[in-house]
């Protein structure tokens, strides 16, 4: 008999196979000798109280051998000569998974990426980290793999109703991801492992007859004579690519793409986003609070670097943590040299002595009305940009970021000294109350005090704020028909993923890319 069993076991006993076998046998009310094999299907940690436990779901073989495990494999048949050509702008998760789905459906994807391939892109991160200079089309936001490649690689998602999440995980594993992402309740790849996975996906696309072009920034959409249907794109070097459809998966930082659409007279919409800071703590502090450790006690065996998720509402606006990076680093995520933007990342082992998270406040469209007359639907981008430029000026240039101890932020004073930080370009003492909008600061102050009651030390003497976090999501939505997924004014244009306002994170963007490819297949040929 092959069955599934859920068990709840304290650590470190949960790490021992024989202890698991006894717990399974007890749950099934059989002798442990009858359990001939077990395989992990899902695991999570229950740290709500002591003792800390693991919740395990196991496939169990009783009185017969356990079938061999078959890891996911993906084979993409070469597309035929007459296959539909689909132009995909952007090679983040939305674009790459759209391309893979096109291949599965017999269409030929033509992927155009403004930045460089992932290996060259990694080299271009050195100037921004070490010399404070951004390579504007090849950085933490732009280039093969998109923003998620070098900003952590979290795969946890709540978007379970948007499509086959398991298919996305299995595709990552088929291209080299650790199979543990199939069983972990909060899967994470790591910025050190994602590049090779992205390269493997590119190889799959090319081997099946697709194309991937780097340093190919799209500057114009090509339309039919009536201007009602898109038929291709033009890149900055003048090359034109034609196809039956254009999937626009350019990410939340491709501001020139929004301006291109606005200048064409296409409808764009304002949407909520969030701004704030990165908050950094010693990882040992977060471990101690989340795992109920005594002062100075090491993290117990079998426990990963602890994480947290915090959220509340203050005066009608959300205040929350964002993209929490246990054992991680704060990185410079600007896309132009006159701005400072911070983000977080972790490597696969999550073994940095620091934890960090975005700590942000919701910005509603009406909060950007000061920019509305000049910028219209792009008022949120103007709001972001103004804050990013001011952040650069406060930091003193060269990607240095303004920073402040949390207790000094609450007291409204510049920090006399700053702790060691993971942010490599460096930090400058500054009163962030004078940098962020007052409506954001007041909610941040109240949120810090509130969250400190839930997570002791969150607003303590070891907590550091680094400004500013502005790229949590796009402040613009590119509208699309709910049924066809095409732009309401331009047939054949499929706004996709996070940059279009329809995703938030790697997995939801990948799912949206798949949906867009499926919608292209359903589109009648003109």
Which stretches of residues belong to each language-model region?
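Residues forming the flavin
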Residues: 1-54, 58-150, 154-526
């Amino acid at each position: 008999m092959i069955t599934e069993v859920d068990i709840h076991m304290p650590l470190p006993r949960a790490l021992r196979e024989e202890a698991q076998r006894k717990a399974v046998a007890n749950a099934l009310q059989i002798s442990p000798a009858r359990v001939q094999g077990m395989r992990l299907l899902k695991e999570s940690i229950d740290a709500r109280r002591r003792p800390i436990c693991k919740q395990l779901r196991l496939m169990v073989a009783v009185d017969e051998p356990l079938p061999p495990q078959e890891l996911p494999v993906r084979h993409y048949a070469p597309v035929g000569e007459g296959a539909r050509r689909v132009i995909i702008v952007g090679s983040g998760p939305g674009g790459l998974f759209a391309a893979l789905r096109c291949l599965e459906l017999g269409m030929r994807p033509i992927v155009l990426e403004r930045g460089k391939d992932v290996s060259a892109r990694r080299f271009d991160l050195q100037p921004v980290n070490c010399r404070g200079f951004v390579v504007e089309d090849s950085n933490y936001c732009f280039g093969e793999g998109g923003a998620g490649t070098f900003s952590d690689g979290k795969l946890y998602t709540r978007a379970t109703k948007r499509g086959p999440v398991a298919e996305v995980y299995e595709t990552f594993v088929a291209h080299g991801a650790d199979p543990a992402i199939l069983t972990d309740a909060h899967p994470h790849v790591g910025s050190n492992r994602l590049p090779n996975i992205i390269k493997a996906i590119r190889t799959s696309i090319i081997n099946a007859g697709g194309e991937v072009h780097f340093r190919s920034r799209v500057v114009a959409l090509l339309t039919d004579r009536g201007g009602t249907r898109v038929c291709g794109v033009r890149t900055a070097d003048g090359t034109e690519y034609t196809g039956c459809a254009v999937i626009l998966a350019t990410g939340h930082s491709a501001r020139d793409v929004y301006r291109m659409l606005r200048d064409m007279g296409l409808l764009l919409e304002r949407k909520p986003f969030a701004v704030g800071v990165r908050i950094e703590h010693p990882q040992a502090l977060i471990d101690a609070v989340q795992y109920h450790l005594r002062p100075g006690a090491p993290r117990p065996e079998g426990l990963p670097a602890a994480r947290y998720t915090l959220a509340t509402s203050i005066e009608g606006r959300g205040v929350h943590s964002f993209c929490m990076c246990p054992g991680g680093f704060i990185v410079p995520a600007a896309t132009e040299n006159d701005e400072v933007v911070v983000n977080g990342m972790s490597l696969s082992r999550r073994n940095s002595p620091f934890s960090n998270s975005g700590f942000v406040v919701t910005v509603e469209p009406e909060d950007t009305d000061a920019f509305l007359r000049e910028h219209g639907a792009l008022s949120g981008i103007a709001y972001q940009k103004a804050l990013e430029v001011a952040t650069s000026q406060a930091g003193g240039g060269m990607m240095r970021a303004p920073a402040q101890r949390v207790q000094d932020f609450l007291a409204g004073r510049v920090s006399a000294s700053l702790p060691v930080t993971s942010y490599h370009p460096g930090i400058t003492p500054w009163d962030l109350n004078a940098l962020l909008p007052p409506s954001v600061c007041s909610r941040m102050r109240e949120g810090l005090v509130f969250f400190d009651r839930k997570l002791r030390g969150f607003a303590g003497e070891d907590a550091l704020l680094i400004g500013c976090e502005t790229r949590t999501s796009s402040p613009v939505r590119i509208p699309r028909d709910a049924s066809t997924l095409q732009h309401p004014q331009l047939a054949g244009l499929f706004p996709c993923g996070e940059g279009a306002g329809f995703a938030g994170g790697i997995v939801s963007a990948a799912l949206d890319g798949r949906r867009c490819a499926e919608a292209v297949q359903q589109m009648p040929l003109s």
